Regions:
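C-terminal, well-structured catalytic/ligand-binding subdomain of enzymes
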Residues: 1-36, 61, 66-177
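Short N-terminal edge-element motif at the start of the domain
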Residues: 20, 31-49, 53
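Short arginine-rich
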Residues: 52-60
């Protein structure tokens, strides 16, 4: 359906702790309903404005949701949300909305988000799928925590391009009908 949801583990904060009451929704439920097209992007936006988004009972995660039109919603339980409409969006395993809250939990040398942002800033208005994969390849992880899937969505083509297990010479394409 063109909806994509990415959940990333993050060090939790008390404000996002799981709560089981009607005014709350877990980040996992929000993401799952969006990916399954049970809710639209606009519905997700309304939900984050009206309800408290909390962690799942057994995991602390944040999410990036995007639709076929290229609209992006970053949701961090207990911290807030942000709608992005630029040419690209980034998320990582620490807070984007309140980075100072997760600074104590950063792994030394894990500067992929910063390196990616820097690389992206060097591109002009013309930014291709090939350019995006060059950036992803430059910041990929290897070893035990290796990047398993890297993907790029082209809103213009309504297609997602992806690479599995860092095999950047084998870019696959899936077009949404």
């Amino acid at each position: 359906n063109g909806n994509v949801g990415t959940l990333l583990y993050v060090h939790g904060n008390p404000e996002g702790a799981y709560q089981d009451f009607k005014g709350c929704m877990t980040i996992a439920d929000l993401t799952e309903q969006f990916v399954q097209a049970k809710i639209s992007f606009d519905d997700a936006l309304q939900i984050v404005q009206e309800r408290k988004i909390v962690y799942a009972p057994d995991a602390t995660m944040q999410a990036m949701l995007s639709d076929q039109k290229g609209r992006v919603l970053i949701v961090e339980p207990g911290i807030g949300w942000r709608e992005d409409d630029g040419r690209c969006s980034l998320i990582t395993n620490y807070s984007i909305l309140a980075p100072e809250s997760t600074v104590p939990f950063l792994v030394p040398g894990d500067d992929r988000y910063e390196r990616t942002a820097q690389l992206l800033s060097t591109y002009g208005k013309q930014f291709t799928v090939t350019d995006a994969f060059s950036v992803l390849q430059a910041v990929r992880q290897e070893g035990i925590w290796a990047t398993r899937v890297s993907f790029v969505y082209s809103a213009k083509e309504h297609a997602v391009y992806y690479v599995e297990n860092n095999h950047f010479s084998r870019i696959e394409r899936y077009e949404f009908s």
